[in-house]
Amino acid sequence: MAGVKALVALSFSGAIGLTFLMLGCALEDYGVYWPLFVLVFHALSPIPHFIAKRATYDSDATSSACRELAYFFTTGIVVSAFGFPVILARVAVIKWGACGLVLAGNAVIFLTIQGFFLVFGRGDDFSWEQW
């Protein structure tokens, strides 16, 4: 039952993050949909982890070059997702209020993605190993 509660909490927090992102685009004062391109970064962020998990064996080694490279690529993707709205606001494509809403949405969505891997990445009875 704890896994179901975690799944509901993760879906609720993901919905909140997407709401912030949509508010940054669709409010009447902002009305520009360029910040929606951060959804590409949200979709790309777990891919290096999936590849590293498939390519390496689960050994007790403290570090793996493949896993470290996946962390590096994931960090680059996350930093790009936070930098993209700032650059758009700096060149006056979007307003700074929209940038703030998109950054808040980014924080919530990336924390949701991290929470998913913390909850379902363990390997207990209620884990989704196919993910």
UniProtKB/Swiss-Prot annotation:
Keywords: Endosome, Golgi apparatus, Membrane, Transmembrane, Transmembrane helix
Listed transmembrane segments: 7-27, 32-52, 69-89, 100-120
Signal peptide: none
Membrane-topology annotation of the record: Multi-pass membrane protein
Molecular function GO terms recorded: signaling receptor binding
GO BP terms, alphabetized: negative regulation of growth hormone receptor signaling pathway; negative regulation of protein localization to cell surface; negative regulation of receptor signaling pathway via JAK-STAT
Coiled coil regions in record: none
Stated role: Negatively regulates leptin receptor (LEPR) cell surface expression, and thus decreases response to leptin/LEP. Negatively regulates growth hormone (GH) receptor cell surface expression in liver. May play a role in liver resistance to GH during periods of reduced nutrient availability.
Subunit structure: Interacts with LEPR. Interacts with RAB13.
Name this protein carries in UniProt: Leptin receptor gene-related protein
